[in-house]
Amino acid sequence: MVLGVAAAWFAITKSKVRAIWCYLCMVVCFFAIIMGSSDNAYLALAALFGFLPLILFKSKTGIRRYLLIIATFGTVIQCIDFINQAYADTVIGLDSLFEILTNFNGLIYVAAGLWVAYIAACLLSKYSRNWTGSVSPALVYGWAGFLLLSVLLAGFLLFHANVGGNAEKYGALEKYLVFNDSWGTNRGYIWRKSFELYRDFKPMHKLFGHGADTFGILTVSKLGAEMPERFENAHNEYLQYFITIGPMGLISYVAFLGSAVTRMWKSLETKPYIIGCCFAIICYITQAVVNISVPITSPVMWMLLSIGMAACNQRNID
């Protein structure tokens, strides 16, 4: 969420001092996410990098800022990889999806190319008259089409690897594409068991759930020693609510978050500062697919959501 706020505000702010501060916060967040060695953080990154262009590609300043953001991310990866190799006997080694990225031999050239593209965009904006005009809406629509194709491609890869039985063709990506009990640090196991437990619910529980915060009680009493490790939550916020407060509660929760994001998104044209709150929530609801609501993050999420909604309802700001 902090990354969503920092990156979004950096992307749209006109104040140089605020831009520098947000940029530094964003860099620290990039380092923290990668060094945390948690793959679920990459879902938030995908949401951030995927949806920001829908706002930024409406102006050439936004295009330059976006190029700077992704170039910085690539540079951060290279820096951490260098530290990993130079101090291999001192630091704790990193793995997960980060390892796949660093093993890509062309990563350094991609990062360098992004910096070249950013510098070229800056030079064009300063010296070229043709670069001072408005940006065609086709760029935003083109990016939206790219996002749609990316989703379809991801769906095809999942189908090809799981239903088609072609898991061995994907090499290091196999553990991300093939769903089994060990997927996602045994998330696959508890997700499968969650649906099996739901299948045995009484009709009333199938509508309204087993009871708030009773997932651990349910798994311990029903699964017991069968579990390879003790699961007191589903490691999926939406599945957790599906089991504990039922489809009715889950639909209400998703509808509330979705309507809040939609309301903030529609207000970005007139109140661009809301973008920080909006992207914080977008990043949160994306990573919630493999995480649950915890006391250290939930209050921050609800606070940012409340600030964003209050700003939408505020008519005049001096």
Model regions and ranges:
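Extracytoplasmic catalytic-loop and juxtamembrane helix elements of membrane-embedded
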Residues: 88-99, 164-182
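Short, charged juxtamembrane terminal tails flanking transmembrane helices
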Residues: 315-318
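Alpha-helical transmembrane segments of multi-pass inner-membrane proteins
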Residues: 1-161, 243-276, 281-289, 300-311
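TM-adjacent membrane-interface loops and short helices in multi-pass inner/ER membrane proteins
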Residues: 181-231, 238, 245-252
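Short aromatic-rich membrane-water interface segments that cap or initiate transmembrane helices
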Residues: 97-106, 179, 183, 233-241
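Generic alpha-helical secondary structure signal
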Residues: 2, 189, 210, 214-217, ...
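Phosphate/oxyanion-binding loops and surfaces in catalytic or ligand/nucleic-acid-binding neighborhoods
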Residues: 197, 201, 222, 288-292, ...
